[in-house]
Amino acid sequence: MLNNKILSCGLTGNFGFFHTKISILYGTNIVSGLNYKKKGSLYLNLPIFSSSYKSVKITKCKISIIFIPSYFCKNIIIENIYSGIKIIVCISEDITLYDMLKIKFFCNKYNILFIGPNSPGIIIPFYKIRLGIFPIKNIIIGNLFIFSRSGTLTYKAIKLSRKNKLGQSLCLGIGGDIIIGLNIKKFFSYFINFNLTKNILIIGEIGSTIENQFLKYKKKKIFFFISGIFSPLKTTMGHSGAINNKFNDILKKIKKIKKYFLILNNLNEINLIK
């Protein structure tokens, strides 16, 4: 992943243009954009292609970043997959459940690493890789891997990690929609032996069981922060995936995690990570 070229799907839109420009200035190797209506034009001195296939064939890109409206995402993502893209980072939010189930099916079938939807993306400071919308003001090279479902809390953790001179080795927003595409085992096959990472901070919340996949992991030191302890039952809090219910009660989750790892009472305790 660290040396692959990147296709920006949605580069020609205002949102995609803005964040693609920031990523390029940061040092990310984005080489092309995608828009069949504007094929042959240049944006940020990058060629715009009519299809993922042409972009992959000509530029040899293996990663795509998705900035397009949610109702177009399914077709573009499946086109990415068939064209040979291996890693897809989806910033778009509110992809329908039906579309996400189809996307997950194709990602599993073709062994694709999919991050999102409704994700701030991924940033790797040492390699100057920014795939998404992360603010770079507080990004500094360090040894803390921040893994989060909440974009806003990720940004706060980044700011506090800089303040406490921890820095970041890698920051990942897994996505806030009800169905996310991330395969944890596949993601860690790429990054678990990432030498720059000393500690992992997992920012969990209500409405998710993804934290449970880390309970018996021992290769790196892991710390948790779980938000939403006072949230009411059966109420969406913040985004569509954050729902506290009797099948995934947050207090039961915290009790289970405490058996294995330290849980921070709030993110200001990030200075406990050493």
Model region roles, listed by residue range:
Residues M1-K274:
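Catalytic-core regions of core metabolic enzymes
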